[in-house]
Amino acid sequence: MAKVDLMEYERALELFEPVLGFEVHVELNTKTKMFCGCANEFGSGANTNTCPTCLGLPGGLPHVNEKAIESSIRLGLALGCDIAESSRFARKNYFYPDLAKNFQTSQYDEPIAHDGRVSIELENGRELTIEIERAHMEEDAGKLTHIGGATGRIQGADHSLVDFNRGGVPLVEIVTKMIEGAETDAPEVGRTYVRAIRDIVKALGVSNARMEEGNVRCDANVSLRRRGSSELGTRTETKNVNSLRSIERAVRYEIQRQAAILEAGGAIVQETRHWHEDTGSTSAGRPKSDADDYRYFPEPDLVPVAPSREWIEELRGTLPEPPAARRKRLTAEWGFTALEFQDVANADLLDELEATIAAGAAPAAARKWWTGEIARVANAQGVAAGTLVAPEHVAELAGLVEAGTLTDRLARQVLEGVIAGEGRPQEVVDARGLAVVSDDGALVAAIDEALAAQPDVLAKIRDGKVQAAGAVIGAVMKAMKGQADAARVRELVLERASQ
């Protein structure tokens, strides 16, 4: 890829105002596809979840997935949108190898939801309201794998493989209105907005929201307006960016790239662009089409979607607490920093943590166990942390540590037993005999034996070299099989050595 000149970011912002727009594609986690009965599953063998309808074969007629309609309405409501009394599907006509029918069933001028808003808060405390123009339903395309060539893109590839398992999976595309005023925060605005959308769909349960699996993908639109001018610049659309960090980097890169071109007297081409994570850069894709180029027309095989007011209000009643409001409430209740809270949220452990704290655990202890040892075991086993252990058992375990019955080391062994199905934490402690030895008499006996075996260490301690006590403490902990409080052992070692 040819090297591209970039303008320093700060200089670019002195000369130009960035104008942003984002299109976030959310894959719905329905059991079946949008217009047929094929399974909606990630990771199945290539082209195993297909049928005449999603392959566009003659005679394959679509029928709408009611659950997808329900999820789309709930998502629209959570975004503060108005839900249309009637919305219509349309055919979006274009040719690409991953589109079996040579058209995509989408929505055009009659989307299911419109005119919403999402509030975000940046790291500097600045709050912005992002206006939502529309949220419309559509089907996903298949997945292409390009073989050969240097870029992994279709250009230059020897050949391409297409997997239509994803073709027909239900999507909601959320389109913002033009975002002005982001200024130097523009890259962070992109990252924070998409994270807010991801958090909303997670809370609703309408999507798995795993960006690494393509459940949430973002197209980032960037243009620059010269300071003092009212004329909007030509925009580019960086397609299918699938991580929060990449969204931030892609927006920043496009600002720097476009600023360098404009300041040199060049012109920005209205086009799609590809994001390259390895080089941290974008490259040209295809000329950006306008709506007329897609020759939209109403889908003749599907009737309009006309949800009743009663059903919409019923679905409104199922909405959970908004993630932003929950974040503020729990951060205040738990005393977490923004970073500590985000660690828990990113690990998808808010429900588990809240239940653990409600069961009596201190917030810091609950966070430590869920984001530490439990998360480690879950990652090793390839399962969700919440499936390993009940929140009330984590609270009980934390209570045993706080009471001094267990050290952290012993508590990890107890957790291992709980996960293995040996019972509640106290039952595992009793069965395995893992409680901390609290009898000072037994500890003193072990300490005296260790001091007698290491007279040189005893001499060093008496000479004021207290760090030498570590050897004795280690010997005592070994003799007690780790079932002693190291801090208490240290106190007793220094006490006995001074006699």
Curated annotation (Swiss-Prot):
* Gene3D superfamilies, sorted: 1.10.10.410
Under Enzyme Commission nomenclature, its number is: 6.3.5.-
One of the GO biological process terms: glutaminyl-tRNAGln biosynthesis via transamidation
- Its EC top class is ligase
Which SUPFAM superfamilies has this protein been placed in? GatB/YqeY motif, Glutamine synthetase/guanido kinase
Q: Please identify the protein, giving its name as recorded.
A: Aspartyl/glutamyl-tRNA(Asn/Gln) amidotransferase subunit B
- So what does this thing catalyse? L-glutamyl-tRNA(Gln) + L-glutamine + ATP + H2O = L-glutaminyl-tRNA(Gln) + L-glutamate + ADP + phosphate + H(+); L-aspartyl-tRNA(Asn) + L-glutamine + ATP + H2O = L-asparaginyl-tRNA(Asn) + L-glutamate + ADP + phosphate + 2 H(+)
Q: Which UniProt keywords apply?
A: ATP-binding, Ligase, Nucleotide-binding, Protein biosynthesis
Q: Which gene carries the instructions for this protein? A: gatB
Q: Which residues form a coiled coil?
A: none
